[in-house]
């Protein structure tokens, strides 16, 4: 079992020698809102930005416990994936190959909040929560390829409630009537002011 995982040695990410000019842009929101598309658009427009796709970690990392294997279905509820994301972020920062890390992820539980938002509090972070009217969100979910529609719809109320009750310092962007590029532009303008 590697460090930082359940039963292993807990890492202290705040005391690492982390790059001072690094920024993290958290693209947050419920499932199907367009986090990945917006994050990809941002990375195309910011030199030396790096996209770290949380969803891609499911291909790379496998469950380490029965609760991860058989527990809640959404990836952010699986501690081993959140721990893997922490490790990936730390590695990218320490390598120093980029100065802006863009991470689309639904930060919809206390473990994500603690490990990711609080865990990297010593790095300049910009947290954006994307929202949309419910009917528009349902349309987006139904029109996406490679989307687990049942998962997205099932956990939407829980995700929406968590995001509404946490992260009061995050910037909320209603994407209902916005294109992907216009959302990306608004985020970039916000962090460069």
Residue ranges: model-predicted function:
Residues 27:
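Hydrophobic anchor at the beta1->P-loop junction of P-loop NTPases
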Residues 30:
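P-loop (Walker A) phosphate-binding loop of NTP-binding proteins
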Residues 33:
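ATP-binding Walker
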Residues 36:
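Walker A/P-loop
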Residues 40-83:
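Conserved substrate/cofactor phosphate-moiety recognition/catalytic segment
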Residues 80-121:
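Glycine-rich phosphate-binding loop used to anchor ATP phosphates in small-molecule kinases
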Residues 122-140:
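Conserved phosphate-donor/acceptor-positioning beta-strand/loop module used by diverse small-molecule
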Residues 143-186:
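Small-molecule kinase domains that catalyze NTP-dependent phosphoryl transfer to phosphate-bearing small molecules
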């Amino acid at each position: 079992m590697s460090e930082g995982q359940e039963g292993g040695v807990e890492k202290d990410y705040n005391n690492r020698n982390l790059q001072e000019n690094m920024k993290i842009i958290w693209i947050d929101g419920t499932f199907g809102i367009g986090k990945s598309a917006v994050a990809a658009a941002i990375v195309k427009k910011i030199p030396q930005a790096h996209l770290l796709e949380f969803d891609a970690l499911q291909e790379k990392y496998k469950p380490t416990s029965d609760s991860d294997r058989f527990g809640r279905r959404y990836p952010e509820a699986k501690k081993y994936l959140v721990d893997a994301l922490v490790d990936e972020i730390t590695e990218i920062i320490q390598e120093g190959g980029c100065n802006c890390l863009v991470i689309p992820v639904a930060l919809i539980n206390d473990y994500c909040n603690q490990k990711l938002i609080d865990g990297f509090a010593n790095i300049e972070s910009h947290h954006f929560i994307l929202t949309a009217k419910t009917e528009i969100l349902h349309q987006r979910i139904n029109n996406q390829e490679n989307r687990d529609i049942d998962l997205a719809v099932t956990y939407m109320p829980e995700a929406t409630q968590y995001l509404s009750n946490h992260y009061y310092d995050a910037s909320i962007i209603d994407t209902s009537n916005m294109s992907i590029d216009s959302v990306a532009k608004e985020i970039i303008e916000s962090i460069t002011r």
